[in-house]
């Protein structure tokens, strides 16, 4: 009421009006009623996304994890020309790979002019991030990390035409005994073991030496400590290498609370990379026999695999509509089966 007409209202009326206004606009119930809860999207952080892809694909193949630490399994060979591993002379566990043999042989049972050493086992990544690996030698060496090795990767003969995988570091062709360094980088998920193999040889050079180092996330170059090396083998883990946008850590921890155009572009690239990983490993992941050539049967098995992958990714059985959108839609006559699998995986991701 106007100040000059106060007599027109009573204290009871004023109280009733105030209670009504407070209840209608300012009380907790009113604020909740007048400001409905907003639906917000959330997403996986980049670390959780990579872990989800790794777990999803690893679930389709037999996996091995290490049980011991203390170094790598080493086997020393006498070489003979093209045959780098003509005769095994010594097997032992080497805590680290940092040797300077000079003009001597590593063991009395092999000659100093030509020999080879194979170190194999696993390396444990203490944290998630990009790891760099470096090999230093005046001789020849190849380093493989987190790779499913092919027959040719035993590096027994230089004239072998067996299939090889691309080495992370390849210094196989020496340069007149001059010391060289080679390095490579890859993203590893923390808390997991990854297969590691280093093949090294000397052939007629004056001296022999080899050193294996790494640069973990947030750390300097250093020798790989024996505490993270194991003589046991482990299974390669499929890890996507797509670069993700920075996460929001304003609350003290990473959280995925915003879905931007940049994020959509990133997960599209990540989904494409995941489909490539699946295609590379398809026979093993889908359990396809090497002698199976019938297209109808291959298509059926691949569709079953894609449906199983989708169910695991969505954590629920597929209904008819969802199976059509993620699997059946992509397997059409005239389309290569591998391309159909890639499109199905991309749709799921």
Where are these regions (language model features)?
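Aromatic- and Gly/Pro-enriched helix-to-coil junctions and flexible linker segments
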Residues: 1-66, 234-288, 311-312, 317-319, ...
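Glycine- and acidic
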Residues: 2-3, 34-35, 117-122, 177-182, ...
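Primarily short, surface-exposed interaction patches in extracytoplasmic proteins
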Residues: 190, 291, 295-349
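Residue-level detector of secondary-structure boundary/capping sites
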Residues: 8, 12, 40-45, 68-72, ...
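Acidic/polar, compositionally biased interaction segments
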Residues: 63-257
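A generic secondary-structure signal for well-formed alpha-helical elements
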Residues: 21-29, 48, 56-64, 127, ...
